[in-house]
Amino acid sequence: MDIILWLQAVILGLVQGMTEFLPISSTAHLILFSDLLGWKSIWHKTALDAMQFGSVIAVLGYFWQDIHQIVQGSWQAWQRRDWQREEWKLLLGITVGTIPALAAGLLLKLAKVELDRPQIIATMAIAMAILLGLAEQWGSRKRTYQDIGILDGFLVGCGQMIALLPGASRSGSTLAAALALGLERPTAARFSFLLGIPTLTIATLVQAKDVFDEGTLLIPLVIATLSSMVFSYLAIAWLLQFLQRHSTWVFIWYRIGLGSALWGAIALGSLQS
């Protein structure tokens, strides 16, 4: 039984890590993957929370130099009253952009709204594909880090708010918003990741109690977290490299195919609410 749990932990961590930071929705894949394999026990729900730790550690580790530079540069800007400094504008953009998702997430939690339904996942998979396609088609892709300001942070943060709907994808919604605002692809992806750090970290801390309550399954939870951390790091590195030379159309078509397949499965009764 232990070996089976450990294997499940590795697989779930792989799915979480490879989909959390790609614009294809980790929540959708984890929910559907668990549903198809019959992994819907309390342990698996706890594992989903634990794996967020792995993703947070990965993104913090990958962007540690960026974070250090933003904090240091912002402190220097504060001392010199240099409000046009790049790091200061980035910090303000990230701070303001974090507010919409946190506010919406708090409201959903207080209202105890359940959104993890196959119909919502399938709909959002296709809807976000359309939005990402429009952003890819019409975005100018000329703006860089130097051009990012508070308004950009707020608007991309509103995109992050959409990711509260399963199937939308935090990476997909923020990437679409950033591209629509004219940011070049690598800059859009990098800003998307940096903007997600506060939200992911806070959400993970909120879920921490559920993880630590599951003390009897500590080893599988640690394995799932480590697996998620490794594959999250690899996914971040791969996506940033990929977007240096390619568009997001491969993800757009993937989402359309995924959403269509899900609706087919729902129609056939393979996926239940």
UniProtKB/Swiss-Prot annotation:
PANTHER family xref list: UNDECAPRENYL-DIPHOSPHATASE
Enzyme superclass (EC): hydrolase
Keywords recorded for this protein, A-Z: Antibiotic resistance, Cell inner membrane, Cell membrane, Cell shape, Cell wall biogenesis/degradation, Hydrolase, Membrane, Peptidoglycan synthesis, Transmembrane, Transmembrane helix
Protein's cellular compartments: Cell inner membrane
EC number: 3.6.1.27
Membrane topology: Multi-pass membrane protein
Pfam families, alphabetized: BacA
Reaction it catalyzes: di-trans,octa-cis-undecaprenyl diphosphate + H2O = di-trans,octa-cis-undecaprenyl phosphate + phosphate + H(+)
Predominant location: membrane
HAMAP family with a match to the protein in the record: Undec_diphosphatase (MF_01006)
Entry GO terms, CC: plasma membrane
Record-level GO BP terms: cell wall organization; peptidoglycan biosynthetic process; regulation of cell shape; response to antibiotic
Identification of the protein by name: Undecaprenyl-diphosphatase
TM spans (from-to): 3-23, 47-67, 90-110, 120-140, 148-168, 186-206, 217-237, 249-269
Function field: Catalyzes the dephosphorylation of undecaprenyl diphosphate (UPP). Confers resistance to bacitracin.
Note: Bacitracin is thought to be involved in the inhibition of peptidoglycan synthesis by sequestering undecaprenyl diphosphate, thereby reducing the pool of lipid carrier available.
Family: Belongs to the UppP family.
Molecular function terms from GO: undecaprenyl-diphosphatase activity
Lineage, top ranks: Bacteria, Bacillati, Cyanobacteriota, Cyanophyceae, Acaryochloridales
Keyword Ribosomal protein: no
